[in-house]
């Protein structure tokens, strides 16, 4: 289930992150890659220990906390603190698999990567190439979203970033451990939540149909969530 979530960051938040990135230190992006991914990864990242990273990390985490679509679709239990990268002309990231388990840099805790997110920080017309490509059996899907928009997709998907041929592509990326590991069950919960929200626009909250469907949602959460 791939979900495009518009305006995760406000225009002002994007501009502030861009300003921070303009003055930040950048290092080889392979520092956070596994052995296989490191062989095909060619980009730059902001160091995890830097003040720039910490400030932007907090901006993104606050934005995720207030975004109902992300919280409904991901049902997040833990989030690997967002990372920030840059692809200049000639840089790319060939098809690769993300690690199933990732550490949290500051605490050493480990997170199971159920969902991957890319939060775009450059406008599509600022660079050529640089599309995020999801490789599914028999098909591929390319994404290049407006600054502030995010794509959420299962970490099980093979994916790549096309070579940038002009300009620079700025983005944040991170992983989420969901309270529900199974993708099919997460989809059911997301669709059920959206149905309840739609029903509430047409019926009062104390309507029996709304109450019964909401009760079903929470009973499924009790059955399927692992905390």
UniProtKB/Swiss-Prot annotation:
Cofactors that this protein relies on: Fe(2+); L-ascorbate
Residues noted as binding 2-oxoglutarate in the record, renumbered to the chain: 169
One of the GO BP terms on file: DNA damage response
Residues that coordinate or bind Fe cation: 96, 98, 159
Keyword presence, Hydrolase: no
Cofactor: binding details: Binds 1 Fe(2+) ion per subunit.
Keywords: Dioxygenase, Iron, Metal-binding, Oxidoreductase, Vitamin C
The keyword DNA damage appears for this protein: no
Gene Ontology molecular function: any one: L-ascorbic acid binding
Enzyme class: oxidoreductase
Stretches assigned to the Fe2OG dioxygenase domain: 78-178
InterPro entries, per the entry: Oxoglu/Fe-dep_dioxygenase_dom, PKHD_C, PKHD_hydroxylase, Pro_4_hyd_alph, Pro_4_hyd_alph_FE2OG_OXY
EC number(s) on file: 1.14.11.-
Pfam family, one: 2OG-FeII_Oxy_3
NCBIfam families: PRK05467.1-3, PRK05467.1-4
Designated name of the protein: PKHD-type hydroxylase GDI1238/Gdia_1949
Organism: Gluconacetobacter diazotrophicus (strain ATCC 49037 / DSM 5601 / CCUG 37298 / CIP 103539 / LMG 7603 / PAl5)
């Amino acid at each position: 289930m791939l979900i495009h979530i518009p305006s995760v960051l406000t225009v002002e938040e994007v501009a502030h992150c861009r300003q921070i990135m303009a003055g930040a230190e950048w290092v080889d992006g392979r520092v956070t890659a596994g052995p296989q991914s490191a062989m095909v990864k060619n980009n730059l990242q902001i160091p995890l220990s830097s003040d720039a990273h910490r400030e932007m990390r907090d901006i993104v985490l606050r934005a995720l906390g207030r975004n109902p679509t992300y919280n409904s679709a991901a049902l997040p239990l833990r989030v690997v603190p967002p990372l920030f990268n840059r692809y200049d002309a000639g840089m790319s990231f060939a098809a690769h698999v993300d690690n199933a388990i990732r550490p949290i840099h500051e605490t050493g805790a480990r997170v199971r990567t159920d969902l991957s997110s890319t939060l775009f920080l450059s406008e599509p017309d600022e660079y050529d190439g640089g599309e995020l490509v999801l490789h599914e059996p028999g098909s591929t899907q390319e994404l290049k979203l407006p600054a502030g928009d995010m794509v959420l997709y299962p970490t099980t998907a093979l994916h790549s970033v096309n070579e940038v041929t002009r300009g620079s592509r700025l983005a944040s990326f991170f992983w989420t451990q969901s309270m529900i590991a199974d993708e099919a069950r997460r989809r059911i919960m997301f669709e059920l939540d959206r149905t309840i929200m739609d029903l509430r626009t047409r019926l009062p909250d104390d309507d029996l149909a709304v109450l019964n469907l909401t009760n079903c949602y929470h009973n499924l959460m009790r059955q399927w969530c692992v905390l």
